[in-house]
Design a protein with these regions (language model features):
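Amphipathic alpha-helical segments that form well-ordered structural scaffolds
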Residues: 1, 37, 41, 166-174, ...
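Flavin (FAD/FMN) cofactor-binding and adjacent substrate-gating region
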Residues: 1-45, 195-207
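General small-molecule cofactor/ligand-binding pocket signal
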Residues: 8-10, 48-50, 181-185
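Helical element adjacent to the flavin cofactor pocket in flavoenzyme catalytic cores
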Residues: 22-78, 225-235
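Central helical "cap/lid" subdomain
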Residues: 64-109, 118-123, 131-134, 145-146
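Flavin-binding catalytic cores
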Residues: 121, 133-191
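C-terminal catalytic lobe of FAD-dependent flavoproteins
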Residues: 169-239
């Protein structure tokens, strides 16, 4: 694939329990800095930002165009409700040995894991299996009371319900001194994907006209946000 796409890479000594390990150039972003950039861009553009408010359909009144981009809560605001697959996911934030600082590593392909820099010194972990605590298919997520208290509240320190031990057990197969990490805490959220797509893990970005002046945007990948915005503009100009 890398050869076909003419992407640079270098073979290095393979990590334990891997057939091949490749070093590649990959762009990452600092989520803290990105937050500041987006916030400043909104303010400088005269966009009114309203936080800590529950939006209802009554709030749609008085606008030329309404774009619903509420991810797991799309069905809360749309008349035509769709079924999705909802997954309560945990993203542990850890401090790894210094040799991992600034490095992003993905073990692929299959039920494996990844680690990515988070801020200046920490990493955030991902795992195809152990990141998911609960899952359901339907029009709205079903979340246990134990996990509901953690959702979308940033890094939860010393969470009672965590799979960090399973993350560590998996990571030890591939990463030296992985069990020496410090668990800073974990973030919890609801990942929303199309139902029954385990065979290809498809994560499409969908821009739909819901009728009248209402549009919806369904996407869970930050790297598609610009394409999604451009597609929305194209649809608005076409309609």
């Amino acid at each position: 694939f890398l050869n076909e796409m003419d992407l640079p890479y270098k073979k290095v000594d393979p990590l334990p329990n891997t057939a091949i390990t490749l070093k590649v150039e990959e762009e990452l972003f600092d989520n803290y800095k990105l937050y500041e950039l987006v916030r400043n861009k909104l303010w400088s553009s005269g966009v009114e930002v309203i936080k800590n408010k529950t939006t209802t359909k009554d709030d749609f009144k008085g606008y030329d165009v309404v774009v619903v981009a509420t991810y797991a809560k799309l069905n809360d605001l749309l008349e035509d409700k769709k079924e999705y697959q909802f997954e309560v996911c945990e993203k542990p934030v850890v401090r790894l040995p210094r040799e991992y600082q600034g490095k992003s590593i993905v073990i692929m392909d299959g039920p494996f894991m990844c680690l990515d820099p988070y801020g200046q010194r920490n990493h955030v972990l991902g795992n195809v299996v152990h990141a998911i605590h609960e899952t359901n298919i339907g029009e709205e997520p079903i979340v246990s009371d134990e996990l509901k208290q953690y959702l979308n509240k940033g890094v939860i320190e010393k969470p009672k319900h965590t799979n960090i031990d399973k993350f560590i057990k998996t990571g030890k197969r591939f990463f030296k001194d992985f069990d020496k990490l410090k668990h800073i805490g974990s973030m919890y959220t609801i990942r929303t994907v199309q139902k029954n797509r385990e065979h290809d893990d498809a994560r499409p970005t969908l821009v739909n006209h819901e009728g009248g002046n209402v549009y919806s945007l369904f996407s869970g990948k930050i790297d598609t946000c610009v394409d999604a915005a451009n597609e929305l503009i194209r649809r608005l100009q076409g309609d």
